[in-house]
Swiss-Prot record:
Naturally occurring in which organism (per UniProt): Prochlorococcus marinus (strain SARG / CCMP1375 / SS120)
A single BP term in Gene Ontology: coenzyme A biosynthetic process
Chief place where the protein resides: cytoplasm
Gene Ontology CC: one annotated term: cytoplasm
Marked site positions, Transition state stabilizer: H16
Obligatory cofactor(s): Mg(2+)
Protein's name according to its UniProt entry: Phosphopantetheine adenylyltransferase
Keyword annotations of the record: ATP-binding, Coenzyme A biosynthesis, Cytoplasm, Magnesium, Nucleotide-binding, Nucleotidyltransferase, Transferase
NCBIfam families assigned: coaD_prev_kdtB, cyt_tran_rel
Pathway: Cofactor biosynthesis; coenzyme A biosynthesis; CoA from (R)-pantothenate: step 4/5
Length: 161
């Protein structure tokens, strides 16, 4: 069985990485799909986010990383994936993700959404929080993989944002 783990991963956090590791135990293949969203101004290019994920998951053999545009459910269908993985940090995540899951099911009933609860130690993490802490000079080493921390420190030290 294959599972699709979609997201912007801008940046990849240790919460994302925890879900990837756990999914790799549960599924034969974990496809990490990096969303190309033209309506947002990402901190990192899609290609850099893919590089960060590759570096951070290099010890895992069941991982495939790609980018996509458009609807996640259409991406899943095109890859012949039956499951979409979503992480839940809090009840607010569940409400939002449940809406998306129902929408996806209305488009394609063959694709199920699977929810995994985030480890408690990562429940406060979000890409937005990480960027804000980094922007104000805070330590993010316990929030993101080393490659991401290095990239963010470089960006915010140089004032590129």
């Amino acid at each position: 069985m294959k599972v699709l783990y979609p997201g912007s991963f801008d940046p990849l956090t240790l919460g994302h990485l925890d879900l990837i590791h756990r999914a790799s135990v549960l599924y034969e293949e974990v496809i990490i799909a990096v969303l190309e969203n033209s309506t947002k101004s990402p901190t990192f290019s899609v290609s850099r986010r893919i590089e960060q994920i590759k570096e951070s998951t290099k010890e895992l053999s069941k991982i495939k990383i790609l980018s996509y545009k458009g609807l996640t459910v259409e991406c899943a269908k095109s890859l012949d994936v039956d499951f979409i993985l979503r992480g839940l940090r809090a009840m607010s995540d569940f409400e939002y993700e449940l809406q998306i899951a129902h929408t996806n099911r209305s488009i394609d009933k063959s694709i199920e959404t699977i929810f995994l609860a985030t480890e408690a130690r990562h429940s406060f993490l979000s890409s937005s929080v990480v960027k804000e802490v980094a922007m104000f000079g805070g330590n993010i080493d316990h929030m993101v993989p080393a490659i991401v921390a290095k990239d963010l420190y470089k960006i915010y030290k140089q004032g590129d944002i």
